[in-house]
Amino acid sequence: DVDVASIPANLAATLFNKTKGAYKVACLNVLNVLYIVETGSAISKLTDLKGKTLYASGKGAVPEYTLSYLLSKNGMTLGEDVQVEWKSEHTECVAALAQDPEGIALLPQPFVTVAQSKNSQIRIALDLGAEWEAVNPQSKLIAGVTIISSKLISDSPDAVTALLSHYKDSVAFAVDHPDDAATLVGKYGIVPEPIAKVALPKCNITYIDGADMKSALSSYLGILAEANPQAVGGQVPGDDFYFGA
């Protein structure tokens, strides 16, 4: 019943496969938001995680897939060389970090900023987007995409074009005027305005469509699928997955 949604990139592929093409991806809207954070200075490279236990949320989802892949590319195995204490919510990771002065966590924005607001000693140790590009120079770590129902595309193409035009403008507004956007984020109860003001510029919000979208997303999904086919619903979708490309 949903015509348009913003969801994790791998979930878009899974949904496309499971619904036999009921939704197409229209644009990328968020690039990397995943970071390794700590209160100390023990972590400066991925191999420093060996023998450590991290707090994280997202088991069976992008955080786990990304961490597992990057560890494997650096000669380590998740669950053997690096342990994770999985939490059901990112907020639980923030709470655990607040109680553990030696804690290390895998967190997305804006929860990194939330954690830092509670403890100014928490620092970003690793940017997983940078780590991803270090082993895949031609690929980007993609967090989110916007999907549109194939039926809406077929029945109301002009409405879809108008929607995407307004959406592109909205993204530009959030990127160019983060303080104003943060006011709206606070107003609608997404996260408090002070957190949003700090976090928004760090969230890698973007609007990428057409051929650039297809190139970046197909590369990203291909890498995920090679490591774990179930991460993308069994297989990387074909050309008909991409709207306007």
Kindly label every feature range from the protein language model.
Residues 78-82, 189-201, 231-238:
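Short, surface-exposed acidic
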Residues 32, 50, 142-144, 237:
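Residues that flank catalytic or metal-binding motifs in active/ligand-binding sites
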Residues 1-80, 84-86, 103, 109, ...:
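Short, glycine-/small- and polar/acidic-enriched structural segments
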